[in-house]
Amino acid sequence: MWGGIMRFERDPKRPQRVICAIDEDECVECSVCLRSGCCPTDALYQPELEWPRILRKNFSDPLKVHPETRIPGRGTEEMKTNEVTGRFPRGKFGMALELGRPGVGTRFRDAEKVAMALAEIGIGFEENNPLTKLMVDRKTGRIDPRVLDEKVLSAIVEFLIPEEMLPRVLDVLDRVSREVDTVFVGDIITRVAKDGSVPYIDVLRKRNRFMSINGKSNVGLGWPLANV
């Protein structure tokens, strides 16, 4: 994000001198520039952040422990602990829509558009997700209007659906993707079938959806095991 938030200005005291400044409106407070040591004059520093701007850091800095989830990052543990939590049983799909990813960023205003579009078809949002915590009305997906213009590296709309609802959700995402001023990727979480197949593959192939080879797998090493 460093290259995308730089702004060049003339020094008002020495007009022949051009200085580099950070566009505070575009900065998502990810702290990558600080950790990278990219400034040769060591001019970068972390200002004190107040609410609602502190939300940018909570959602963007992977080393910042989010106060709502008490884990680093902007999401939940989702399938990574499913063998113990049992959040994703057979017959259900967990879905996560990562607004602003990869590398573009998003404002909560766009996250709200996606959430509200899904709420119209009866989607309920994951209770422990940090974005859900910002909703003032979870039945409609409406987010606190005071934070809508805050920009973050990404924000995740997370929910659980029955398998048969996937085509309808994809229809909604096709529509709302043309209404937001950012990009997003979709994640689907499910138990692999007993024959080793993935239950949603055929649905996505029929729609010519790109499926990344990258993913997360839970191999069931936790204890005690949940009945899923």
Question: What is the meaning of each model-derived region?
Answer:
Residues 1-52:
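Iron-sulfur cluster-binding cysteine motifs and their immediate structural context
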Residues 92-101, 155:
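Short glycine-/aliphatic-rich beta-strand segments at the starts of folded cytosolic domains
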Residues 58, 96-99, 111:
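Extended, surface-exposed interaction regions
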